[in-house]
Amino acid sequence: MNLIVTDIERITVRAPMTPRCEEWNAREVWQWCICEIIRLTTDAGIVGYGETLPHYTWGRVSDEAIARVKGQNAADFLGDDTLCAGLHMAIYDVVGKALNVPAYRLFIMPK
């Protein structure tokens, strides 16, 4: 399977919260409302999405991670825990779509 990554877009959003959650977040973890959405496109036209809370997980997707993945086969990065969570999820999403299986099934597939 050849899924060459042609584009990776980072979209940062501030998710609205209920007043109760806003109050709690203001005291504890105010940055939990900030999300980074990753949109990964392949040469086959398949688009995969991933998301992360950059202040809670591994952080924002770095320029270095994008440069490492862009132009490469997305399937080669399955199981690569050095990528940030959002990019890793987008890779699983795009490979799952290419194989016509839910992304979670990729965790139990033989290599």
Task: Identify the role of each PLM range.
Residues 7-8, 40-110:
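Metal- or metallocofactor-binding catalytic centers and their adjacent structured scaffolds
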